[in-house]
Amino acid sequence: EFRRVLFRSVGLVELTNPSQVLISEKPKDVSGSVIISTVEGTRPMLLELQALVAPTNFGMARRTSTGVDFNRVALLLAVLEKRIGLQIQNQDVYINVVGGIKINEPSIDLGIVIAVASSFRNIPIASDVVVTGEVGLTGEIRAVSYIEKRIAECKKLGFKKIVIPRNNYEAVKDVKGIEIIPVDNLRQAINIVLRG
């Protein structure tokens, strides 16, 4: 369980808004960095997820992940290669969830593939965008739980846009104060997010 406390000189201090702290150092105008929406228990959290894609110096490309399941990353990279045609088989791929947090929720799938595509193409992701969605093997974007809470957290922290699965859109289409962008598949999501 993610503890919402910070260690200060006076001891442990309750952290009232973990999302704010965890995304406060996100670099602007750098490829491979995206804000994702996850849920810990029933509490929504926004986190920064980073990907670095670089040509390999060895015969076999390296795949490394910190904070996310390695097998899930391997699956998502295969989907990117097969469904999008991203030629990453000869590229080292490093994935990191900033803050040392471990996430075991499929809603971060879309963030992983967007960050990888961003790094590979060297196209930064707008800093006012959040992404959430499970990615299926055919490249479809599947619905996530607690979509209303995720969007409320994005609004609270001043984000202007959130990319969500189309199957979640009906429940939140009337929400004001944030642009909600529904997507059906991976190609559509990448094109929307990477064009700004």
Regions found by a protein language model. Give the residues of each.
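Peripheral, non-AAA+ core regions of ATP-driven protein-machinery
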Residues: 3-39, 43-196
